[in-house]
Amino acid sequence: MKSSVLASVFAFVLFAPLSGALAGYTSLFVFGDSLSDSGNNAVALAPNVTPVPIPGNSFIATFPYMSGRYTNAQVWAQILASSLGLSANPSLLGGTDYAFGGALTGGSNPIPPSLEMQAALFLSQHGPMIPSNALYIVEGGGENAQQALVAAGGCGSNLACINGIIQSTTAGYVGDIQTIDTELEAAGAKNIVVWNVPNIGVTPAVLAEGSAASMLGTTIASVMNNALSTAIGMDSDIKLFDDFSLLNQVIADPGAFGLSNVTDACAQFTACIEDPSKFLFWDGVHPTSAAKTIISDAIESLVVPEPSTLALLTAAFLGFGFVLCSGGTRLYSGRPTGPE
């Protein structure tokens, strides 16, 4: 009887904190833009908020919505943190999410602070050595890509001009991400996830500008991502989260992800504001919280061991065998010899 209870308790302890404890993460630190901002801009820009309904697909919010974020509810970082048994509260409120809406990956403008500035602030608060068993997620580049798209639009049909903007944007973006990764690793980080750039060409705001803008937006993101993949290379401390491909997969087969509309901004429709669960986009570029859940699930599958791996680890651990004997608990190898 006691051995059965012990086995049940052991199984519960082993599998209950499946994502957090077995993955070994003690904290989640996030650096990013509006896709990741869990409330920093809401604090910094209060009491300004973006009202709904919004005018249409072209609308991109400057201020957070009533949720305090650039979406209808939680961002992916909060959803992921909850699943891992951690938290991702805004850094301005003492939390571990340093993301600010509108942030570029680098640059000298402090408002909003770039990802490089966010990482520097984090290191000044937690350095010189940071937790090696924490999870660090670097999400950025979408703002860089959008600025490049606007700038390239001013080139007209001048391909040299367009290519120059794409190349300079890409070089700056990759350099910024490499700087952040290098600084985190030098301080002790061992678990870093870097997002690539989302396919801005398929967002409602860019689609509203026509097919040429859409194709150019996709091209810009693709070039940036190819360079990022090459730069990250075989660094064992860094995992690449392919948000570009995930977005394409969702749009290609929305039903498989529980969605029905992947082209329109939900927040322009009163009915959708009340129930946004079937829409991919909340406004012209920002996903709904339903889409953020898809993102969170994908990241979790990247950073948490597969169930099969966990099962093998469990079997190996149990192979040593814990048994509760009449005189107490002892470790054994092989078959039990005492009474249950």
What are these regions (language model features)?
Residues M1-A7, S308:
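Bacterial N-terminal signal peptides that target proteins for export
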Residues A7-S8, F12, L312, R330, ...:
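Low-complexity, intrinsically disordered segments with a bias for serine/threonine
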Residues S8-P17, G319:
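Bacterial N-terminal signal peptides
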Residues F15-G20, V323-G327:
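C-terminal segment of classical bacterial N-terminal signal peptides
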Residues G20-S308:
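Conserved active-site regions of diverse hydrolases
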Residues E306-S326:
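A short, hydrophobic C-terminal helix/tail in secreted or cell-surface proteins
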Residues G321-E340:
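C-terminal membrane-anchoring or membrane-association module
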